[in-house]
Amino acid sequence: MLLRKYLLVTESQVSKCGFLIVKKKRDVLYPKRTKYSKYRKGRCSRGCKPDGTQLGFGRYGTKSCRAGRLSYRAIEAARRAIIGHFHRAMSGQFRRNGKIWVRVLADIPITGKPTEVRMGRGKGNPTGWIARVSRGQILFEMDGVSLSNARQALH
């Protein structure tokens, strides 16, 4: 499965959650405006940041085991896989009671150049979006589902 390197979190604790203005285009969430159109790649920190490491909305969640980058396609594919499993397992009960929160946002643009292009002439055009994920960060939260259904959806 896509989320093999992530854990299921079950403790209910309150945390601060920052909200960003996002735009949705073709099932992709990305920031409405950024200060610059192109950013540097940067490095992912190895440590654990205190923000976003505790559940804030639901009863269950997925927690990252290590730091890294998640593309907007991976976030959307995981969200669709989780929702699809709940729809199959719980039929109409999930539509009435269940809810999923996506706690990560792909907010950093990634640039790329076409293949077989000579070196130089700038950085390239933005091709996609990524999210930097630190160790211990909550990625998805779920509510209105049982613990067994949540475990099956994430494995």
Swiss-Prot record:
GO terms for molecular function: rRNA binding; structural constituent of ribosome. One of its GO terms (cellular component) is mitochondrial large ribosomal subunit. Its main location: mitochondrion. Pfam families: Ribosomal_L16. Keywords: Mitochondrion, Ribonucleoprotein, Ribosomal protein. It is found in: Mitochondrion. One of its GO terms (biological process) is mitochondrial translation. It comes from Petunia hybrida (Petunia). This is Large ribosomal subunit protein uL16m. PROSITE patterns: RIBOSOMAL_L16_1, RIBOSOMAL_L16_2. Belongs to the universal ribosomal protein uL16 family. InterPro entries: Ribosomal_uL16, Ribosomal_uL16_bact-type, Ribosomal_uL16_CS, Ribosomal_uL16_dom, Ribosomal_uL16_sf. The gene is RPL16. Gene3D superfamilies: Ribosomal protein L10e/L16 (3.90.1170.10).
